[in-house]
């Protein structure tokens, strides 16, 4: 069976003819003091055949009058119970509120619909377990400045509460409330707004922070320059270009921004300022880019700004490249379409001097550097460990290794380096079987390069081979020594020749 309300909802939207007052009252569609009620669609009602009200306004008025029957009817027609509660609060109709108390999940949900501070506070009081802090927090959430104004004097000395409300307003980006708090209370940490602005990426909030900070400067001694520098560093680090520009309005150094932009590869910021930056600063930025291991695009931007002219900082650049083991700038200079700048040899020298075997091998692979070039430099710098490790890695066969090391000696002019290589070759032969040809070739090699001690050692080793062939070898070595005035080699060769001759005489 249909209820009366269901019949009304179904049939009395647009009756064929006006119903009399008695009929409307019997149907429960008469609102005392207002007239008949008729539903108009889903959101409106018609009162007394004349006035059209929103259904929520109607239910609010009915609740304020304490008219339980009309409230019930309007709820069936789709009215919002929250507006009924608001109306009941306006005229303190608490009995009506008690009827619907169980249908309200959280009284706080109603607060956003209220603009009257008195009603707002009454509604909040329905949450019997809530505190004043909760009231203030919701007031901030709903932009109810009037609530804060009411308790302004009470909170003036509560530093903790003021700070909490200020930061909450900042997080909610409620600019009116933020401004009111900053202007009416003493906020201990006024700078908290900047941290929140960075997190929210809210430039308006950021600008407000500077306005408050400048106001505070008139009554407090603060290091404004230090604050701006800190902001510039962070904004540039995060690539917040608009924040950088905003901070620079109040002072600060562009250099601070540039060094952070290079370090964190924010080319938009870098490109904006680079063309007005002094050359000396750009050179420092390039060195910083190496230290920070900047990206290829960042490095190219700096190099192009210098027009690839780096002669004034070559030593510093090489030092930075080797120290930080970051070779990108060397590669970019080498890849330049015109007027390539080859710093590979210069870097190699410094790497061999200061770096490990693994780092040098990596450099060799990256720039296609031959092992011979590396070994030459290592010999000049007396890096025995590198000579051993690299030659062993490249030429695993010992005879092959000796062959290549001998070729390097032939092409070297550095005397101490040659000697070091020749000693290294001799050390390899100590653990290697050599046939007569290989042994004689190495002996002659030492004679050619005036390595007296090694020549003598090889001569002694060669006595296990045919003495006639050895005497012929010594004659050749003597001829070489006389030709180049290698006195000690000549004396040693003569001595061994006489020794062989004496052996033959004794055998006769």
From Swiss-Prot:
Induction note: Expressed in the early phase of the viral replicative cycle.
InterPro entries: Ankyrin_rpt-contain_sf, MGF_505
Keyword Repeat: yes
Pfam families documented for this protein: DUF249 (PF03158)
Keyword Repeat: yes
Alphabetically ordered keywords of this record: ANK repeat, Early protein, Repeat
ANK repeat coordinates: 54-83, 253-282, 313-343
Similarity comment text for this entry: Belongs to the asfivirus MGF 505 family.
Biological role stated in the UniProt entry: Plays a role in virus cell tropism, and may be required for efficient virus replication in macrophages.
Protein name as catalogued: Protein MGF 505-9R
Native organism: African swine fever virus (isolate Pig/Kenya/KEN-50/1950)
Lineage: Viruses, Varidnaviria, Bamfordvirae, Nucleocytoviricota, Pokkesviricetes
């Amino acid at each position: 069976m249909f209820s009366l309300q269901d019949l009304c909802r179904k049939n009395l939207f647009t009756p064929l003819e006006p119903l009399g007052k008695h009929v409307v009252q019997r149907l429960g569609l008469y609102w005392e003091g207002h007239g008949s009620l008729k539903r108009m669609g889903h959101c409106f009602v018609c009162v007394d055949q004349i006035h059209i009200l929103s259904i929520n306004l109607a239910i609010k008025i009915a609740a304020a009058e304490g008219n339980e029957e009309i409230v019930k009817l309007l709820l069936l027609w789709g009215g919002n119970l929250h507006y009924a509660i608001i109306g009941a609060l306006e005229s303190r109709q608490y009995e009506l509120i008690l009827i619907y108390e169980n249908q309200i999940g959280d009284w706080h949900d109603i607060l956003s619909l209220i603009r009257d501070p008195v009603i707002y506070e009454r509604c909040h009081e329905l949450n019997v377990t809530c505190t004043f802090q909760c009231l203030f927090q919701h007031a901030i959430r709903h932009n109810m400045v009037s609530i804060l104004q009411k308790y302004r004097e009470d909170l003036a000395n509560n530093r903790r509460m003021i700070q909490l409300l200020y930061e909450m307003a900042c997080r909610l980006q409620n600019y009116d409330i933020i401004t009111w708090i900053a202007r009416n209370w003493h906020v201990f940490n006024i700078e908290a707004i900047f941290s929140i602005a960075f997190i929210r990426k809210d430039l308006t909030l950021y600008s407000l922070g500077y306005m408050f900070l400048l106001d505070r400067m008139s009554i407090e001694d603060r290091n404004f320059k230090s604050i701006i520098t800190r902001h510039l560093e962070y904004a540039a680090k995060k690539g917040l270009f608009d924040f950088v520009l905003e901070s620079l309005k109040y002072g600060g150094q562009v250099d601070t921004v540039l060094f952070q932009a290079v370090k964190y590869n924010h080319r938009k910021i870098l490109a904006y300022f680079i063309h007005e930056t002094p050359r000396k600063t750009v050179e420092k930025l390039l060195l910083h880019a190496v230290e920070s291991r900047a990206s290829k695009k960042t490095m190219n931007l700096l190099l192009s700004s210098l027009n690839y002219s780096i002669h004034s900082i070559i030593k510093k650049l090489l030092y930075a490249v080797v120290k930080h083991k970051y070779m990108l700038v060397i590669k970019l200079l080498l890849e330049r379409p015109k007027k390539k700048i080859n710093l590979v040899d210069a870097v190699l020298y410094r790497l061999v001097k200061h770096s490990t075997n693994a780092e040098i091998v990596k450099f060799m692979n990256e720039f296609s550097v031959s092992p011979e070039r590396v070994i030459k430099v290592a010999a000049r710098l007396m890096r025995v460990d590198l000579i051993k490790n690299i030659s062993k890695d490249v030429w695993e066969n010992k005879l092959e290794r000796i062959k290549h090391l001998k070729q390097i000696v032939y092409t070297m002019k550095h005397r101490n380096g040659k000697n070091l290589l020749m000693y290294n070759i001799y050390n390899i032969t100590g653990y290697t079987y050599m046939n007569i040809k290989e042994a004689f070739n190495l002996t002659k090699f030492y004679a050619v390069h005036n390595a007296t001690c090694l020549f003598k050692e090889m001569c002694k080793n060669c006595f296990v081979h045919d003495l006639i062939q050895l005497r012929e070898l010594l004659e050749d070595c003597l001829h070489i020594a006389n030709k180049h005035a290698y006195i000690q080699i000549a004396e040693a060769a003569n001595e061994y020749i006489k020794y062989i001759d004496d052996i033959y005489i004794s055998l006769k």
